[in-house]
Amino acid sequence: MLADGFETDIAIPSGISRPDAAALQRCEGRVVFLPTIRRQLTLADVAHESFVSGGVSPDTLGLLLAYRRRFPAVITRVLPTRIVACPLDVGLTHAGTVNLRNTSPVDLCNGDPISLVPPVFEGQATDVRLDSLDLTLRFPVPLPSPLAREIVARLVARGIRDLNPSPRNPGGLPDLNVLYYNGSRLSLLADVQQLGPVNAELRSLVLNMVYSITEGTTIILTLIPRLFALSAQDGYVNALLQMQSVTREAAQLIHPEAPALMQDGERRLPLYEALVAWLTHAGQLGDTLALAPVVRVCTFDGAAVVRSGDMAPVIRYP
């Protein structure tokens, strides 16, 4: 690992047993979520029990929401009395790298942006139970961001279905639990039971969708006259509007001037300001369904593909 700046020391209680200490030694390269950026924290601050709210342990969507409020850090060293972790937000500089263990069932390729999701795959356990301390470490799974986006979309769809189950199909939907990535078949076994996280995701999703649809339709209707005029000279717009007519062919020869657009006039909103707002919210719709990438795989002189269980050198995501 190249030298970086900030590191967090996570204190290990003195009452830990030897088997539990040995289990911690195997956690190098895994990710924990820090509640705050500090030099000194305790193991209880990053354990799964710290995510419990009101005596209720969060389900998969609840963990996703909690991840957004915390700071990911990669465990770089495990010493007898403390764990050294590198916060990815402040500890990993643009010139530094850390080694991230690939605990996902898929390969990580050089250049892949990596997102973190809770354990969601069938037959995969990422928990480390420390019986002597009565604590559990539940590590997230690093996945390529495109795969993580699809998984989160499936989890939200399952949660929405649970909010309004169909009496005609009381069972589960098997299609939502199986997906394919790079030729591999992956089975999801996620815990989506609590309605609070589903309502939070659904509220953001519906508000963004309603805004994008209504404002996008208004902007398209406003731009239609100009699109028709541009179709006389632009083959792509021409095909888009399907103007296969003699009028189109004549217009291509005449080259009419496109009508000028007024910013205000009789319109409800200034056109270009509305277009900027719509593009911004359309991008936020994707951000609602996926965690942003935290790092990028960067293999300098090693293999370009990092297999499951191996260490992947990663750099800060730009």
UniProtKB/Swiss-Prot annotation:
The keyword Mitochondrion does not apply. Disulfide bonds: none annotated. It is found in: Virion; Host nucleus. It comes from the Viruses. InterPro entries: Herpes_capsid_2 (IPR002690). Keywords: Capsid protein, Host nucleus, Virion. GO terms for molecular function: structural molecule activity. Its main location: virion. GO terms for cellular component: host cell nucleus; viral capsid. Belongs to the herpesviridae TRX2 protein family. Interacts with TRX1 and major capisd protein/MCP. Structural component of the T=16 icosahedral capsid. The capsid is composed of pentamers and hexamers of major capsid protein/MCP, which are linked together by heterotrimers called triplexes. These triplexes are formed by a single molecule of triplex protein 1/TRX1 and two copies of triplex protein 2/TRX2. Additionally, TRX1 is required for efficient transport of TRX2 to the nucleus, which is the site of capsid assembly. This is Triplex capsid protein 2. It comes from Human herpesvirus 1 (strain 17) (HHV-1).
